[in-house]
């Protein structure tokens, strides 16, 4: 459903949820509906109070409200979308032949670069422009950067002339790379491992990136934070499908990942979770809920 419709429903004072089942197959045999099945009731004569944030668990609602009161910035503020990296016009100045190249798709000859995607680092761009602008080794004397993506179903980094990649806030910073499609959206599941992006490395649309750090240590600390149960519990409030878009990170608080943080990042993931529980003043019941509903990541 459209975002505007969802927001309208969540802020409707006359709407309430009567029933929710996350596993749609329990309601409709052999049917997988991402996000589950919900039955709502609307009474225009009665005010029920706006839902605002919907979760299947009452304890999770109280956790969200506690954390929200202390959130100054959200992790979504430093999440960069799959489409955030772009080509420059210079690539086509140096390689005008790309615009006239074709390929066979579903038995038809089509342009190599799809209409409207001239500057996009699409998920299959390595296969399309391999040994044209993307290479396994540096070419010539021009300065190169690396792009992280997939080629022949494997994660790889390929070199490209720096002048062919548009300026980006985290290209020359440390960051994390996550697949743009990750997991199923089931609450508490384990996430696919992230990769630390070094300085001078960007990504194709197969990935999102998080952070623009001056030090590698900050990226490592973020990586540890995202293995924490509390962070993932808050992520899966909005991440109800495999889609790993920027907006689903809204309720995950941004932390200070430097050595000056109020969190001791040298500790284990489990010990960091305990620090976070204290920071957000969670009760024993709230902690038990997270510990029993969110799978461990070491």
Q: How should these model regions be labeled?
A:
Residues 1-26, 39-42, 222:
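Conserved Class I SAM-dependent methyltransferase catalytic core
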Residues 31-204, 211-263, 267-284:
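C-terminal substrate-recognition regions of SAM-dependent nucleic acid methyltransferases
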Residues 285-298:
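Short, amphipathic C-terminal "tail helix"
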